[in-house]
Regions:
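Conserved short beta-strand edge segments in small beta-sheet-based binding/regulatory domains
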Residues: 60-70, 106, 178-187
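An extended, acidic, His-containing surface patch that forms the Zn2+-binding/catalytic region
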Residues: 77-148, 158-163, 167, 182-277
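Short amphipathic alpha-helices in soluble, non-transmembrane regions
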Residues: 47-60, 88-90, 101-102, 167-176
Length: 277
C-alpha cells in the first residue's frame, strides 16, 4: 500500500562528563542507524581478548580489534537502517558500548550510554517507551563524535502522533542527567497526520484501490519525516509494499521498475480525485 506519514520528530544529544575513551566516531547522518564506528581506548591487560570475545557474539557484519602503543582501536561495522525503523539495523556504536561493558572496561560514559540509550530502540532508557494505535516511539543513535575530549551522540526519536510535546518532556526529564553524562532535548517538531476519514486520505486511497484492486490493505502509517510538513494540507504519498525491504537510507536502496510504473498510474488517478474535492 501507499503510506501516509505521521509522528513528530525529536532530537536529543547525549554528552559524556568523564570518560577514559580517547576517541569515538561513527555515523554520517542523524536519521539513520550508525552503521560504522571506530573507538580508541587505553590498553589494559587482557582487554583486547575480552573485547574480541564479546564482539564475536554480536550481529555486527564486521569488527576488528588492534592494540598498538598502549592503545586499543575497535572498528565495528553494523547494519544501516532508517531512523523510523531502527530495529531493522545493527547500531555499531551501541554494540561497541555494550561490548566495552561486557569486556570489563570500567567507564562512566559507557555506563551512562548503556543505561540510557543502549541497543534497544524503544526509548525505555530515557523513560520514553510509548505506543499508540498508530505505532511505537522509536529511538535511533545516528552519529557519535569526539570533540575536545567530549563524546556526543546524536539521537533521532520519532514520537507517536498522540503524544504531545509537553508529555514527552515530562516523561523523560528525570532521566536526562546523572554523574556520568547528560542528555539535551532539542525542539519537538509538529507531526503530520490526517485522519483516515479525511477527504484528502480518502481521495488518495481511492486512487490506490482503483489502480491496484487491493481493498485488503489500509493506508500505512509510518514514522518517517517528510518535507510535506512545510506546506498546509499536504501529505506524503508514495509506494512502499509490505514485506519488501527497500533498504531505505542504506546501501543498495531500490524500487522496482514495475512499482514505479504502477505509481505513475496511481498518481494520475490521485490528481483527478484531488481536483474533485
Amino acid at each position: 500500500s501507499f503510506p501516509t506519514r505521521r509522528s513528530s520528530d525529536l532530537s536529543m544529544t547525549a554528552y559524556s562528563k568523564n570518560t577514559k575513551i580517547i576517541s569515538m566516531n561513527g555515523g554520517f547522518v542523524s536519521n539513520a542507524v550508525c552503521d560504522t564506528c571506530t573507538t580508541v581506548i587505553p590498553a589494559e591487560v587482557g582487554l583486547k581478548e575480552r573485547l574480541e570475545a564479546a564482539l564475536a557474539e554480536t550481529k555486527l557484519q564486521q569488527y576488528q580489534v588492534t592494540e598498538q602503543n598502549g592503545q586499543i582501536t575497535i572498528f565495528a561495522k553494523g547494519v544501516p537502517a532508517h531512523a523510523s525503523t531502527p530495529q531493522l539495523g545493527v547500531n555499531a556504536a551501541g554494540v561497541t558500548f555494550e561490548c566495552l561493558e561486557k569486556a570489563g572496561f570500567d567507564d562512566d560514559f559507557v555506563k551512562f550510554y548503556n543505561e540510557h540509550i543502549g541497543t534497544s530502540c524503544d526509548g525505555a532508557g530515557v523513560g520514553l517507551k510509548f505506543e499508540d494505535e498508530y505505532g511505537a516511539l522509536t529511538l535511533c543513535n545516528g552519529i557519535v563524535k569526539t570533540e575536545d575530549g567530549i563524546i556526543s551522540c546524536t539521537i533521532d526519536i520519532r514520537v507517536p502522533v498522540t503524544l504531545k510535546a509537553a508529555d514527552v518532556r515530562t516523561m523523560c526529564e528525570a532521566r536526562l542527567e546523572d554523574e556520568n553524562g547528560r542528555i539535551e532535548i532539542g525542539e519537538i517538531g509538529d507531526p503530520l497526520f490526517f485522519p483516515r476519514e479525511s477527504p484528502l486520505v480518502n481521495a488518495l486511497y481511492k486512487a490506490y484501490v482503483d489502480v491496484t484492486g487491493d481493498t485488503e490493505h489500509e493506508p500505512m502509517v509510518i514514522g518517517g519525516g517528510t518535507y510535506a510538513k512545510s506546506l498546509k494540507n499536504i501529505i506524503a504519498f508514495g509506494p512502499e509494499k509490505l514485506g519488501m525491504n527497500y533498504h531505505i537510507h542504506s546501501a543498495d536502496e531500490f524500487i522496482l521498475v514495475s512499482e514505479m510504473e504502477e505509481a505513475v498510474l496511481i498518481y494520475m488517478e490521485a490528481i483527478k480525485n484531488l481536483l474533485a474535492i
